[in-house]
Regions:
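Bacterial N-terminal signal peptides
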Residues: 1-7
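OB-fold and OB-like single-stranded nucleic-acid-recognition modules
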Residues: 7-106
Length: 106
């Protein structure tokens, strides 16, 4: 039993404080491809399919891609403050965020 308790206490792994810090859209746009980000803001508009315009508290906008399964149980509208976690996806002309998870900020 003691070994079970010890293994539960040891469960987990390395968590960088930098991966959970919220940054601005402006800062996210400066990061390298595949950089992990956490953003807070609102969905400004639905572009098409799984692409949305996301706006932060500074009114900066970035396109985010949220697959249906990544929404989980979250239902949101233009007034819902969200926290999104994902990766920067840069190509030659555009930068977007591939979203891994969405949660409502309470």
């Amino acid at each position: 039993m003691a070994s079970l308790v010890a293994s539960i206490a040891m469960a987990g792994g390395f968590t960088s404080k930098h991966q959970s810090e919220t940054i601005s859209v402006k800062d996210a746009l400066k990061l390298n491809d595949d950089a992990k980000v956490v953003l807070e803001g609102k969905i400004k508009s639905h572009i098409k399919s799984d692409k949305y315009e996301f706006v932060d508290k500074n009114s900066d906008v970035i396109v985010v891609e949220i697959d249906n399964k990544k929404w989980g149980n979250v239902t949101a509208n233009e007034d819902t403050l969200l926290r999104i976690r994902g990766e920067v996806d840069k190509d030659f002309t555009k930068t977007k965020i591939d979203v891994g998870s969405v949660e409502v900020v309470k």
